[in-house]
Amino acid sequence: MKQEYKLKMLESEIRKVLSEALMEMKDPNIDPMKSLITISRVEVSKDKRYADVYVSVLGDEAKRKDVVNYFEQKKGYFRTYVAKNIRMYTAPELRFKEDKGIEATVRIGQLLDSIKESQKGDDNK
């Protein structure tokens, strides 16, 4: 139980540090999109060697893939930033992935809204 708690705290701290790194990053390719990018969650392996970083991006499919690929290219920068800001024996290897959970949540909300609208239309008849 204690080990799981420590792992969750580490995941939370890495997520916070990566968000800071993103905001401090000075790159003209990513600057216009910073407000559309969110580090939604981090999952660290039990041995703390790997961290799966889930990134959510508002925009179309191509933009989401471009951002995840960009993060993969810059993972050395992010890993160095994590190593400097979190006291660990070794910084975990970061693996960036697209978080589709937020997109699914928005889609479900849209479907529920359309159902409400159709029910209102049926009630008026």
From Swiss-Prot:
Belongs to the RbfA family. GO terms for biological process: maturation of SSU-rRNA. Keywords: Cytoplasm, Ribosome biogenesis. Monomer. Binds 30S ribosomal subunits, but not 50S ribosomal subunits or 70S ribosomes. One of several proteins that assist in the late maturation steps of the functional core of the 30S ribosomal subunit. Associates with free 30S ribosomal subunits (but not with 30S subunits that are part of 70S ribosomes or polysomes). Required for efficient processing of 16S rRNA. May interact with the 5'-terminal helix region of 16S rRNA. Gene3D superfamilies: 3.30.300.20. Pfam families: RBFA (PF02033). Disulfide bonds: none annotated. GO terms for cellular component: cytosol. GO terms for molecular function: ribosomal small subunit binding. PANTHER family: RIBOSOME-BINDING FACTOR A, CHLOROPLASTIC-RELATED. It is found in: Cytoplasm. Signal peptide: none annotated. The keyword Nucleotidyltransferase does not apply. The gene is rbfA. This is Ribosome-binding factor A. InterPro entries: KH_dom-like_a/b, RbfA, RbfA_dom_sf, Ribosome-bd_factorA_CS. PROSITE patterns: RBFA.
